[in-house]
Amino acid sequence: MNSNPLRALSYKDWAKSSTENSMYDLGFDIKPIKNLVISGQMNYKRYEYKTKNYTATHSAINHFETGNPIPGTESTSPNSMSMHWISNSTMLTTLTAKYDMNFGKHTINLLAGTSYEHYNYERLYSKRTDFVSDGLEDIEQGNEVSKETPGGNSIVESKMLSYFGRVNYSYNDRYLLEVNVRADGSSRFYKNNRWGVFPSVSAGWRISEESFMKSIKWVNNMKLRASYGTLGNINNVGYYDYFQLLSSSANYNFSDTAVKGVLEAQIPNTSLGWEKVALTDIGFDLDIFNNKLSLSADYYIKKTSDILLGYNVPKETGIWSNPSLNLAEVQNKGFEMAITHRNQIGDFSYSISANIATNNNKITNLAGSDNMIQNAGDNVRWILKEGESIGSFYGLKTDGLYTQEEIDAGRYYIYGRHPKAGDLKYVPQREGVKYYCDLEKGEPEVNASITDDDRTIIGKDVPDFTYGINISLQWKNWELSAFGQGVSGTNVGFESEQVFAFMLNSNPRKYHLQRWNEENPNPNAAVPRLYGGTSLDEYNKHFSDNQLFDSDYFHIKTLSLGYMVPRNVVTKWGLSSLKFFLTGENLFTLRADKIMKDFDPESSTGRGISALGTKSIAFGVNLSF
């Protein structure tokens, strides 16, 4: 009744808010001498948000028959007003000097510069109650005694200063060399670890420019290239991770009386440093047959070191949160290739491009921590393990569903409770686990129990390879284009709502019709039996490969058909161009697992899995005068 819209209109509640965005850009270019250009730029962005809310007291609703107040429909809290203010700003300034030199067949380009970035965030929140009138908009008119600051106030500030330089060298556009170096200093680190230096070098050889290639007319371009470079990353570093933080949100009991105290919530971490990325790449480019066929291929090795991980601190220290330390290393290596064929035959022209990329992801160092379990939701589990991929799912393996005959014969394992027909058949990974019926007299049931120690790696969400295709066809004034992409060798873990029908008021899915039931006791059914959501009947809720699905797919992202009206026609209508087009998005998807058809194959694991992107067809007209 309190949500009746007509009653809500009679309330004296109100809310006011305002948002302000501003952006400024300034820049200059100076050429003091020949071939020298000095450039400067400043970019400033500011965002401010203000909101003020007032909640009045509400009387009880009167019963429409008796006229008496209905208990529980009146407001039980005093009137109140809250104010919330957020402001953040970013300023980025750069200054560069560029000098170009040419002598003979030699070309040299020099660049040196510096940049400075300043980020500031502020937040204020205030609340007061017991206003003498609902018409007041001044928060100072509230009761001073009841002044509150829930959520508190916060200030965040971050600064980064960088110096960088680059040298490009080319000999006769045949031999190419580039050397880069940059030094970055961030306020997110302690002063002794604030700076990181990141060099890179790349070289190229245009083989097609050599004299011995001149006789091979069908080769337009052939280039061999190699590079090695390093970068620094602070995206995983908090603004104040190296600080010692104290918290007053602690009480201690003295003589049966709770006394407010202060504890060390975060220990100082002065050794915190940059995450480092080192990338080695060898590539080959080829254009042949008057550029009708193009090929580009790369082999890469990417090593990320000093990755931040939470280090477990003994509970006896009283430290709330585990400090982040530069502990882990990860390696990615793979092959990328793209090929394009283009041609024109009379009024018909076409371009077809395809690409494929493989990636082998492996954790090479966890600083002695062999497995670190992480949650991807209420139920989904990942594990970090040396020698395995990031995004490895950690759970129980299954082998179909129990039949009634297996239950009656005791050929099952216990997992907190005894299973029933239609429950998942978990497979133990430890040696010596027995069926319930094989227990000897007096032997504890635990010897027939599945435990968390039976969990193992059951899949991963990092694909083995990705691929895509782009097609463009033109005939006279007509054009047709299509773009599709796909992945292979990956899984997605569904959260409880997607797997179990009706859980947390979720809707059942069509694949739940394939469940095990007494009329269809299929031990290979895709979904186990339905059961009530009680703790005594949740044998199937544990994360297992039954909640993992093959998320390989090929997806037609866009398909477009267009027609350009001839220019000699549109000029008679006072137009310079006129084009009609019909475009479809998310029209077609091939999936390895049919159960996935209700979900977006590009979604990530966990509760964030979303429904399939909406199919859309749009007709439009582009015209210009």
What do the predicted segments below correspond to?
Residues R7, I61-H63, V145, S186, ...:
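Extracytoplasmic gating/loop element in the C-terminal half of outer-membrane beta-barrel translocons
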Residues S10-D13, N143-F164, N251-S294, P323-I345, ...:
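Outer-membrane beta-barrel signature, preferentially recognizing the C-terminal barrel domain
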Residues M1-P5, A56-S77, E122-P150, D241-I267, ...:
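Surface-exposed loop/turn segments flanking beta-strands in extracellular/periplasmic regions
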Residues Y125, Q344-G459, N520:
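Conserved small-residue
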Residues E20-N21, D29-D134, G152-N153, S187-N193, ...:
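Small-side-chain secondary-structure face that scaffolds active or pore-lining regions
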Residues L6-N53, S80-N102, N109, E117, ...:
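Outer-membrane beta-barrel transmembrane strands
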Residues L327-N332, A376-I407, E518-N524, K541-S544, ...:
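C-terminal beta-signal and terminal closure region of outer-membrane beta-barrel proteins
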Residues I33-N35, N102-I108, R174, S208-M222, ...:
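Short loop/turn motifs that connect adjacent beta-strands in outer-membrane beta-barrel proteins
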